[in-house]
């Protein structure tokens, strides 16, 4: 049976939408790796979406984190509705 490695799931709302996307949901092994991972996203390293968002000059910020594994991250992505989970969007009345 596969072991589910617990880590940190994070939600990044974009300053403005990129095509259909207004958020990115990601995962890291532990909170220790979160800030370096965000730095990598800012540098355009890693997820293709974050690379093109950066190339388009679109900023982002960390809105929320959850404890969880890769399976939970994938489930959240499949469910959609990142703007409903995003405290920044809810506060601003913004919908992706």
Locate the predicted segments by residue.
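GIY-YIG nuclease catalytic motif and its immediate N-terminal context
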Residues: 1-39, 53-84, 95-96
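A short N-terminal helical cap/helix-turn-helix that marks the beginning
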Residues: 88-94
């Amino acid at each position: 049976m596969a072991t589910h490695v617990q880590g940190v799931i994070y939600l990044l709302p974009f300053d403005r939408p990129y095509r259909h996307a207004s958020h990115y949901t990601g995962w890291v092994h532990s909170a220790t790796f979160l800030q370096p991972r965000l730095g990598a996203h800012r540098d355009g390293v890693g997820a293709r979406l974050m690379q093109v968002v950066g190339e388009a000059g679109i900023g982002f910020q960390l809105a929320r984190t959850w404890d969880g594994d890769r399976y939970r991250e994938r489930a959240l992505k499949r469910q959609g509705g990142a703007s409903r989970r995003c405290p920044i969007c809810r506060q601003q009345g913004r919908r992706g």
